[in-house]
Amino acid sequence: MSTIKVLNMAGAEVGTVELNDAIFGIEPNQAVVHEVVKNHLANCRQGNQSALTRGEVSGGGKKPWRQKGTGHARQGSTRAPQWTHGGIVFAPKPRSYSYVLNKKVKRLAMKSALSAKAAAGEIIVIDSIKMDSIKTKDFRAFLTAVKADGKSLVVTPAKDEVIVKSARNIPGVVTSMANLINVYDILNAKYLVLDKEALAVIEEVFA
């Protein structure tokens, strides 16, 4: 098991913690990670795009001109796709893009993402992430103290409204509960900032 420092919110070292190699020490499977990220983005799609086919556009019931003798190409409707204001060929309609992946695949991707962060030295463990009041300035100072400036995913063991509201106005900073973290958020962040209790939850869930 690898050992990393545990810091307090002022950035001072207060101890160490061992990371479970079964979660933080595997060889990352990039193909599986790619598939899970693709699935996450597909599931996030609204899928509400919509356009009208030639049969749904109003008007166009009358033949624009007679079939023969005008010198023009033959036309049957002013709402055919080649006309301005005509319908759309194979018009997109609202649909769901979501699909289901196997739990084992998602679990392997999560372990791969966590292992990649650990190998890169981008996991920061805090003994306790707590704030007395909602204060964005103080939360930014905390991230600076622990050297987690920039895009960061801050993980707490349970929902903490004070932490959520203190962090939400800081660009690039995302908060999450330990049981709700996902591969996309982990990879999208430069630093993974974990409450020590949140680390225990992650190891319990994915061990």
Where would I find each of the regions flagged by the language model?
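Exposed boundary/loop context
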Residues: 4, 8, 18, 40, ...
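A short, flexible low-complexity segment enriched in Lys/Arg and Gly/Pro that occurs
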Residues: 31-68
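Extended polybasic, low-complexity segments that bind anionic RNA or targeting/receptor surfaces
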Residues: 1-46, 91-207
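Glycine/serine-rich anion-binding loops at beta->alpha junctions
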Residues: 54-90
